[in-house]
């Protein structure tokens, strides 16, 4: 029997519950940990945190494992949320789940678990860790539709060396089947789709509490005024919904898409048609780079990259490195490259790391 001690981050969802179950079956000394990372506005209307805790507690009781509750709200605000707001103020569209993983789930949580005397932490992420000669690799989850390696690209060797992903080799349907077979109460619970630890509340309404509306004009690329926006920080490149404008006077009924933002002028730029050339770019610049092995990939080798979650891998090459930034060129133009989002580089199933997009080029 394996008596290594592992602390499992239990969110109340089916994935982390089955992760805890599998580790218990494998003989680990398992403790569950429920993270409370958001204090404000914890209302029944928007935040399911209370129900999530009850679900986690119910599963822990069934598995006969202890469940600890830890409040990381201070760390979350300082390490994740403040940067999240700063990026939006600058006109970029950040991915808080990436920061939440690297700073909270695999830093604050890991530090806490190690201080408790644990050997490992575990989560319900669809990803895998592989170790060869002391080098840890992050691999895609076996279920391509659920693979979450994109959100984990900022993890380092120390973090991966203490991490187990118990369901990374499974498909979602198999995870739910295991949960049903063991009569876990959350076997049919729907997946969370909200921002990490902020939940399912309407995003613009939430953001408005911290970044007040600043209305301005919506322009076409030839500076024809076609509408009014609520504040450029509320919109993202490629966005179609919520623009409030119809066809042009020339009669085109193609939908409008956000193609650019000018923070200084407070102007939102739009184009008509999903395949408009202004939405396609052949290369990007990324900064704040993070490579899992500690060493950058080779320049001008053929890799693959994702510029958003669940995107099909796009063949690419890293064409230039400079300080903490790089240029990535794609074999085919990419749609809707968005500053603030992450570009993540892969070699087959291995996630090499990536960076934050700061610009794009034709």
From Swiss-Prot:
Recorded GO CC terms: cytoplasm
Residues involved in ATP binding: 9-16, 35, 124
Catalytic activity: S-sulfanyl-L-cysteinyl-[protein] + uridine(34) in tRNA + AH2 + ATP = 2-thiouridine(34) in tRNA + L-cysteinyl-[protein] + A + AMP + diphosphate + H(+)
GO molecular function list: ATP binding; tRNA binding; tRNA-uridine 2-sulfurtransferase activity
Signal peptide: none
Predominant location: cytoplasm
Localization terms from the record: Cytoplasm
This enzyme's EC code(s): 2.8.1.13
Positions marked as site (Interaction with tRNA): 125, 341
Region described as Interaction with target base in tRNA: 95-97
Cysteine pairings via disulfide bonds: 100-196
GO biological processes: tRNA wobble position uridine thiolation
Active site: 100, 196
Sorted UniProt keywords: ATP-binding, Cytoplasm, Disulfide bond, Nucleotide-binding, RNA-binding, Transferase, tRNA processing, tRNA-binding
Family note: Belongs to the MnmA/TRMU family.
Entries under HAMAP family matching the protein: tRNA_thiouridyl_MnmA (MF_00144)
Biological role: Catalyzes the 2-thiolation of uridine at the wobble position (U34) of tRNA, leading to the formation of s(2)U34.
Protein name, UniProt field: tRNA-specific 2-thiouridylase MnmA
Species of origin: Nitrosomonas europaea (strain ATCC 19718 / CIP 103999 / KCTC 2705 / NBRC 14298)
